[in-house]
Amino acid sequence: KIYVCNTLRTTVCIHAAVCTIENKGISDCICKVKKGGFSKVGEVQIKPFKRVLVANRGEIAIRVYRALNELGITTVGIYSKEDRYALFRSKADESYQLKENKGPVDAYLDIKGIIEIAKKANVDAIHPGYGFLSENPDFVEACEEAGIVFIGPSKDIMNAMGDKISSKQMAIKAGVPIIPGVDHALKTEEEVMKVADMVGYPVMLKASNGGGGRGMRIVNNAEDMPKEYREACNESKKAFGDDQIFIEKYIRGPKHIEVQVLADNYGNVVHLYDRDCSVQRRHQKVVEYAPAFSIPETTRQIIFDSAIKLCKQVGYRNAVYKA
């Protein structure tokens, strides 16, 4: 049986329509998308997810459960021994306890244990939420090897965009605006001093694999650079496993604006508008609010266009389905 969708032709809307059809007792259906609109492939055949495991906890897991419930998908949860009485456990249709010897945090980082539960529960896909394993390419690879769909970016995209130097190079290829600086690792103090003079102080030293607010140092003058560079390399080596450092111009009092994007398997990318994340402590966001205010609409549109352009350049996807 073939049903033609008259809804918005994006992966998420199509998936929701197919789930609705299935929930009404119509089986073995094919969703056919007419050529045009947002679809670039002409015809898409989708097998809706029936069971999805959420590899997270707390409010994050509850939000994903709710979205899955709205689509008529069975939710499978995981929880540590310490979380056995937590609210989120009862919100899933099925829940499985993680290994007891892992602790309250490491239990949610146990790739092997989570995959074992996913197989036992016979799930079609795993949604990582955010944090924990959501940006771990090894987890994505483990899902692929188990024949389970990972709802998120591919491991190649994670590896490429998780490295700040690599991601900056991709941004340059995409033709999107970037902060003045260099797109390669600096190997010597002499090279660092030369680049800093070229960019102009103040500058920021950044670890290519930095994250969590660490791996960034502001340098206001040439006298401080040798010491700051050595300390930045040592910190990066200890915290992230390598000492690749690059330089960007330091911008005082900037607005930190993020854009939420949705990208499917076929290169369709849409933005879900912006949010302001400028309120920070130690380079980590404290408060986010949307939409961002005090931004000219022309600038806002440039940000949206740049986000979509970059996603298309790298082949990013975060809305996936079982084809």
Please tell me what each predicted stretch does.
Residues K1-Y3, V41:
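Accessible peptide chain termini
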